[in-house]
Regions:
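Short hydrophobic alpha-helices and adjacent helix-cap/hinge residues
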Residues: 1-327
Length: 327
């Protein structure tokens, strides 16, 4: 009997050891979306593309991924509040749009993986050591392509052969001053007079356009950051009312009334950023993932705006357009 009991005990013990452990409930990874320019209510085309790509990669919000949205609606002062909150929530990855958000996130969350998607100058901003080997907790996409600044002004001159005095609209508190400086260098090379026009908030736009009319500027080049991007519809409306042609960086501005844009697709960059998030969630380290630069650029023209401004776009420019907006 004693032998039988011992045998049964041994069998039960062996069975318990062999049985798989009951699976523990896994907490889904938590990512945060951080943007100054994004309106907290209206859909943003950049984040729409980002989230769609995450879905295609198999992530379903509320099931296998948790998403924290922190959109400031152009109010840069809210960044500190957002980041303090995210630090307490222990997010796994922060996805950011522009330079300012990315720099603030890196400073506030030095051990959290950060994926940037629309940063102008990640090296100059101190986000990465170099593009090939970021070397820290930040990686992703940059819009930096030095040839773009000259190309945009060349296209503006092609559309408006008589143009000589051009305004450059930018947010001076943004970290993307490299783009502004490169545009000024390109303007000097092309013999254009370039006037810096600084706008820090939506309330300053009316005064800026009063300056444009007073100084009789003939066109406007827009340097994009989160604040400017969020006000693109208002900027386009004021430009048309001032009969001022605009050269912008991305299609999203042309959709709202900018005359011409030449640059990378923000939607394509957002989709690539989602791929970076996927790689990091699967174990890759930001320090080891090279920062990607855009290689494909799109020329977009708004004929409705051209008509409103009384302009005829040269056929040579129309033939090269990737997209023409007529309505």
């Amino acid at each position: 009997m004693m032998i039988l009991r011992a045998a049964l005990a041994a069998a039960l013990t062996a069975g318990l050891l062999a049985a798989p452990l009951a699976p523990r409930a896994q907490t889904p990874p938590r990512i945060a979306l951080l943007s100054i320019g994004t309106d907290p209510v209206k859909p943003n085309p950049v984040w729409v593309q980002f989230l769609d790509q995450l879905g295609q990669l198999g992530y379903v919000e509320g099931r296998n991924i948790a998403i924290e949205r922190r959109f400031a609606g152009g109010r840069q002062e809210r960044l500190a509040e957002f980041l303090a909150d995210l630090a307490g929530r222990r997010v796994d990855i922060v996805a950011t749009t522009g330079d300012v958000e990315s720099v603030a996130a890196k400073q506030a969350l030095p051990t959290t993986s950060i994926v940037m998607m629309l940063v102008q100058d990640p090296i100059g901003a101190g986000l990465v050591a170099n593009l090939a080997h970021p070397g820290g907790n930040v990686t992703g996409l940059t819009t930096l392509a030095p040839e773009l600044y000259t190309k945009r002004l060349e296209l503006l001159k092609e559309a408006l052969p008589a143009v000589a005095r051009v305004g450059m609209l930018l947010n001076p508190t943004s970290a993307n001053m490299a783009a502004a400086n490169a545009t000024e260098t390109a303007a000097r090379r092309l013999g254009l007079q370039l006037r810096r026009l600084e706008v820090r908030d939506p309330q300053g736009l009316s005064e800026t356009f009063s300056t444009i009319r007073r100084e009789r500027l003939q066109a406007l080049v827009v340097v994009t950051d989160g604040v400017v991007f969020n006000q693109r519809a208002q900027i386009a409306d004021l430009a048309i009312k001032s009969r001022l042609p605009m050269m912008c960086e991305v299609k999203e501005f042309v959709v709202t009334g900018c005359l011409v844009a030449y640059g990378p697709s923000y939607g394509a960059l957002a989709r690539r950023a989602a791929v970076y998030v996927d790689k990091i969630l699967k174990g890759a380290k930001p320090a080891d993932l090279p920062v990607e630069q855009p290689t494909n650029f799109e020329l977009v023209i708004n004929l409705k705006t051209a008509k409103a401004l009384g302009l005829t776009i040269p056929p040579s420019l129309m033939q090269r357009a990737d997209q023409v907006i007529e309505q």
